[in-house]
């Protein structure tokens, strides 16, 4: 074996021994040919520490690992002790959050505020009153001086004459799509949740649709909404003139008195619809069209009460409502025209597929009462004129053909109520059998 091969073998053997004594690789620098002062002050202290720890044997390391494995909670306990120590040193944390919202309203400085929740009286927070604002609204929420709300108001049976609003309606007026952000942004408003009895009462009175029966409905008082928004919730409202806290707004000078309040309509097209077509006092849905069929009105009988917005008023918020309202109107028009043609004009209904004129069977003659020859000044006119007289007690009542059914079929089979109904129908058909 040559000297070079022997030297290489000795280096490999030395490396194996080094790895067997320690899991760490040997990063020692060969300083044999380097001129380094042993008393150098800039010598790396980390290198000395690593070199001193190089002699740790595997048994000590394995014992330490075994001890950690036996107590898997050492690290967690150590972290908990550090947290307790930090708390003892004065590190404070807020572990509970206040469940009460902190209303913000004019008239109270930050120095006077505290974390105590405000009192709720008559379903609204007790906020400071403005003498000038009290001349614009009553305690029940009725506006004074000819002012009108942009949204409808109604009362609850057990709340007397106090006026309320659906929270979603003023929310849309001021630019919110729902009431969640409405209450989060305006904590001065108290959220009053209806119970099932109150919802049923409003549904029976026509204020709420039946689909709201199983939903959570939030109300706000009309007085509270006026205090919060002032002229923005008033039809044609003007700054300071129609605001509740007029004195403070006049002092701040942020708005010009008498100028029209900012128009929030562009933020919500549904608000535009509410302003142009406000809900009726009894809460009837304007999409439902009550048609009286036997009035001789023109074809465009709904032009005066058109509730369908034009294309420029459609948006991502109200398109579904506008589509539903248009379908409701179209169905009403079809039904009105069909009944008018059949029963009023007596012209029949032409089928678009077969081009056949259909006439109700109840309007056709069943017998000839007589014929006569009329005197005609024109001898060449040999036409025949049919004069048909229709006599029917009720055109809307169908003819079922019960008058032709013998009594033996249903006697002793049906009860008295059904028998009475059959007899009435038979008598009706017999009276109108011959024209």
Curated annotation (Swiss-Prot):
- GO molecular function per UniProt: chromatin DNA binding
- Give the GO terms filed under biological process for this record: chromatin remodeling; nucleosome disassembly; transcription elongation by RNA polymerase II
Key words of the record: Chromatin regulator, Nucleus, Phosphoprotein, Transcription, Transcription regulation
Chief location of this protein? nucleus
From the Swiss-Prot or TrEMBL record, state where the protein is found.
Nucleus
Q: Does the keyword ATP-binding apply?
A: no
| Comp. bias (Acidic residues) | 30-66
Which InterPro entries does its entry note?
A: CRC_Rsc7/Swp82
A single Pfam family it belongs to is: CRC_subunit
The answer on whether this UniProt entry bears the keyword Transcription regulation reads yes
What additional remark is attached to this entry?
A: Present with 3510 molecules/cell in log phase SD medium.
What's this protein's function? Answer: Component of the chromatin structure remodeling complex (RSC), which is involved in transcription regulation and nucleosome positioning. RSC is responsible for the transfer of a histone octamer from a nucleosome core particle to naked DNA. The reaction requires ATP and involves an activated RSC-nucleosome intermediate. Remodeling reaction also involves DNA translocation, DNA twist and conformational change.
Instruction: Spell out the family assignment given in the record's similarity comment.
Output: Belongs to the RSC7/SWP82 family. RSC7 subfamily.
**In its UniProt entry, what is this protein called?**
Chromatin structure-remodeling complex subunit RSC7
Q: Which organism is it from?
A: Saccharomyces cerevisiae (strain ATCC 204508 / S288c)
Traced from the root, the source organism's taxonomic lineage reads: Eukaryota, Fungi, Dikarya, Ascomycota, Saccharomycotina
GN (gene name) = NPL6
